[in-house]
Structure formats: structure tokens, C-alpha cells
């Protein structure tokens, strides 16, 4: 078969985010493994570009305060970013619309950013955050402004299943 005949075939595409996030499908879950690497690499790249050190350092010349890192999104990439930043000695804050993420974030030693109370209860679908209303997004941005203005590094990992990632900054 020639290359031109192969190119004319109709190719089938499947969105990898539609694979179920269950243990039986774990061997096919390439998104989680790639997200894990992305979260790790994001912190390493940020640390190499930052004009200061991540951990607190006490020297004869004085004390260098630890870097402050804000991670937006507490999924696979976000949790890996938290773990990596904490291992490097940073103070880490995390924002996610899913209340269940708070426990995971705190178990890694990060501080969870409490979002404003609204009538809408954001949730998740298949392990991903659901889309929220523009009103909620506006209130979320207002809450994050304080944390982001004090941060040395911001890592954005927030995703919505089947949609464009939310613009939080």
C-alpha cells in the first residue's frame, strides 16, 4: 500500500479524555501519565527561570524567604506540581472548584484557597471539573487576585472536560 493511498483513507479520531478514569482502563489512560509529567516539568521550568531559590535559605548574609507558588487546578498535573514544589521547599497554595480536592491538597502540605460561596455548586464529571457560570468565574478571579499578586510562580493546570480550559489569570 502506498503512502498516498494511506493518506486518502478516512482516519478515525477519538478524544482521549473520553476514556473512563477507572482502574480497568488505567493502562489506556495516557492523559494522566502525561499530566503527571506536565505538572512535574512545569515546576522545574519555573524554578529554573525564577530569579530566586525555592526553599528558605539561612546564610551569613541573611535569610531568603521561600518562594510562593500558586497552582490553579488540583487534578493530576496540579497535584504533581504541588508535590514537586513542596519537595523543592516552596510555600504552595492551590485553587480548585471541587471541594473534594481540598483533602488531597492538604495531604501534600499545600494550602487550599477557599473559593467564594455562590448558589451554584461546582462539581466534577469523570474526574474533571465541570464548567462554571461566568458569575462564579468572576468571583473566583477576584479571590485569586490576592494570592496571585503575592506569588513568585503561578502554574495553571485547570481543565474542563471537553471544553477549553478556563482563563483564570
Tell what function each PLM region has:
Residues 56-147:
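Glycine-rich phosphate/diphosphate-binding loop of Rossmann-like nucleotide-binding domains
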Residues 1, 159-168:
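Glycine/threonine-rich flexible loop motifs
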Residues 9-19:
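Rossmann-fold dehydrogenase core element
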Residues 1-7, 11:
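Single conserved hydrophobic/aromatic residue that forms the stacking wall/gate
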Residues 17-23, 97-99, 117-118, 159-160:
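Short, ordered loop/turn segments at secondary-structure junctions
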Residues 17-68:
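Phosphate-binding beta-alpha-beta segment of Rossmann-like dinucleotide-binding domains, i.e.
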Residues 151:
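An anion/phosphate-binding loop that grips the pyrophosphate of nucleotide cofactors and donors
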